[in-house]
Design a protein with these regions (language model features):
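Membrane-proximal helix-turn-helix segments that form the acceptor-binding/catalytic region
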Residues: 22-24, 28, 71-78, 93-96, ...
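Nucleotide-activated donor-binding/catalytic signature segment of Leloir-type glycosyltransferases, i.e.
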Residues: 241-268
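A charged, aromatic-enriched C-terminal amphipathic alpha-helix characteristic of glycosyltransferases
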Residues: 338-370
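Nucleotide-sugar-dependent
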Residues: 13, 210, 263-270, 275-299, ...
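Conserved donor-binding/catalytic core segment of Leloir-type glycosyltransferases
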Residues: 4, 145, 193-210, 215-219, ...
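A short helix/loop element that forms part of the nucleotide-sugar donor recognition site in Leloir-type
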Residues: 179-193
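Carbohydrate-associated surface elements
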Residues: 150, 172
């Protein structure tokens, strides 16, 4: 089957990781793919067998980038002549080409809604515009996919989409890569990590969706009391310079380390450095609609996990420590660092592999597509 996949964002977005993972699995199962997106770097992603990859350079001038991406997506779509189109996010640079291709070739178009993107903006023109896109584009698609029950209810109640047009496609993980990963000395050397260091990872965007401003004061106090602890902050974004300056002002730049953007293929090896993974999301409507890839990857890597019950975190309640407030995190992290329970870690890995491994999630999705 020939499938055109249109990513509204760039290769460095968390949503893009989900979409690219689906693309790789579709290609692995023998389908012919053309994958298009905006790209922050010149060459975009690492190439993958079976995927024709194209990207348009992201300049930071959003209206221009969106306009150029819309045109390139349409041109490549016309040339590729897909049997169906899979779109990430209800944005014009993906939805307009998909709708035109549907009108021209009469094929099926599918839209993945994985966030309430407009809720991350303050009241104003941009928020209203993105909300308009959310209300306008989804009704024209043959199928809507989503990964969170709260978000699914929003799509039904607020966007007026029939439940029969919605397919629940969980957030998956490339579990085999995390299960097979080994400690890589290069990463230890890169960040000056010693064998007896107690490493904690916090992986998240440091852009407009970030909640790190709530986490940083807690980490400051925590590392001040435990001299062997080092924090790896994995991620990048527009607010990263602000957070780096705060850490330097605290004098903790050798204890709280910012890795910057990492290629997602590096994550299994980087997580092998750590004992504990933490995830905090403020209890907002936007965050309630999320399905954390971080929690899934932490568990797949065998880490102890401390998080709060926002998004779909409670689905992992038997394998993580849930804290209702940020003030509970230090005690929970300290306890997790002292725990030695490899059997529980293996049970968590099996749970993630059984329920959130991309091969069977994509197989089920394809079966549904063939029936619809």
């Amino acid at each position: 089957m020939k499938i055109l996949m249109l990513n509204a964002l760039t290769e460095q977005s968390g949503s893009g990781i989900r979409f690219w993972s689906i693309a790789k699995e579709l290609a692995r199962q023998g389908h012919s793919l053309c994958f298009l997106e905006r790209s922050i770097t010149k060459n975009g992603r690492m190439r993958n067998v079976g995927i024709r990859y194209r990207s348009s350079q992201d300049t930071g001038i959003q209206w221009l980038d969106m306009l150029r991406a819309t045109w390139l997506n349409l041109c490549h779509g016309l040339k590729f002549r897909p049997q169906w189109v899979f779109v990430l996010k209800p944005m014009p640079n993906t939805c307009l080409p998909a709708l035109f291709l549907k009108w021209l070739f009469k094929h099926k178009i599918v839209l993945d809604i994985d966030d309430l993107d407009f809720d991350y903006y303050l009241d104003g023109t941009r928020r209203q515009l993105v909300r308009f896109f959310f209300q306008s584009f989804p009704p024209h698609f043959d199928l809507i996919t989503t990964h969170n029950r709260y978000l699914q209810n929003f799509i039904i109640d607020e966007l007026g989409i029939s439940p029969e047009k919605i397919y629940f496609l969980p957030q998956g993980v490339e579990t085999n890569k995390f299960l097979q990963a080994q400690v890589d000395q290069r990463y230890q050397e890169r960040w000056g990590i010693k064998p007896d260091d107690e490493v904690i990872v916090y992986s998240a965007s440091l852009g407009i969706t970030s909640d790190f401003q709530h986490v940083l004061p807690m980490l400051k106090d925590f590392v001040g009391k435990r001299e062997k602890v080092k924090i790896l902050v994995i991620g990048d974004g527009s607010r990263k310079p602000h957070f780096v300056n705060k850490v330097e002002a605290y004098g903790l730049q050798e204890r709280i380390l910012f890795t910057g953007y990492l290629n997602h293929a590096e994550m299994p090896m980087v997580l092998k450095l750590a004992k504990v993974g933490i995830n905090y999301m403020a209890p907002t409507r936007a965050n309630q609609s999320r399905a954390s890839i971080k929690v899934r990857e932490y568990l797949a890597a065998g880490l102890k996990v401390v998080c709060n019950p926002v998004g779909d975190a409670e689905a992992f309640k038997d394998y993580v420590t849930l804290c209702t407030g940020i003030e509970e995190f230090p005690g929970a992290i300290g306890k997790a660092l002292g725990e030695k329970n490899p059997e529980k870690a293996r049970e968590a890995q099996k749970f993630v592999e059984r329920n959130f491994s991309w091969p069977h999630l994509v197989e089920d999705f394809l079966s549904h597509l063939k029936k619809s």
